[in-house]
Amino acid sequence: ARQQDPVYAVEGIADDQRVVLERQFPRYSMGGAGLAIDAGHSIVVRSEVAYFDRWHVTNPYRNHGSSQSPMVKSLLGVDYLLRNWLISVQWQEQQLLDWQQGMVQDKREPLFTLSAEGTHLRDRLKSRLVLAMSPPAKDDALLQGIFTYTPVDWLKLGLEVDVFFGKEDRTFGQYSQRDQLRVSAGYLF
């Protein structure tokens, strides 16, 4: 498989003395497993774990601007169906097993998400509300709302809102001054 997020490797120096970077999507091997258990009463408990052998991370201190490390990703989640709403609580953990000085990714990256997805008005209105954060919440959080409305069979309207909080050096906090509002319309055929 290939990494979805690029690693930036140093390609060389341009004539005007700027460093030239190349986006790379390195290959890696991955093994993993998942388990989901129906706990009854509309509750599902799920878990996943994955091991990546050569995960590449941008590192300006290394030759060609990148390092590699084995990485483990794990997830524990609980889903609850309440009428027309699917409520999910999820804890994810990502850990570089051979973290090196200069890597632009933290050795350990936890992520907590709480989401609710629902349908209303005979499935014409769909809502998704999300709170995502890396502890502590005041340092790194995202509030997101996604709404789609289909007033007639051939028209789909959308509204998405992202509000970021936190410190500039954190995953969501780096966008704290760039909240987003997106409006869309689509013709369905």
Q: Where are the regions a protein language model picked out?
A:
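Structural signature of outer-membrane beta-barrel channels/translocons
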Residues: A36-D38, D79-R83, E117-L121, T148-T150, ...
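Membrane-embedded beta-strand positions in outer-membrane beta-barrel channels/transporters
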Residues: M30-G34, K73-G77, T113-S115, Q144, ...
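Outer-membrane beta-barrel "beta-signal"
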Residues: S176-F189
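Transmembrane beta-barrel strands of outer-membrane/channel proteins
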Residues: A1, G31, S47-Y51, V89-E93, ...
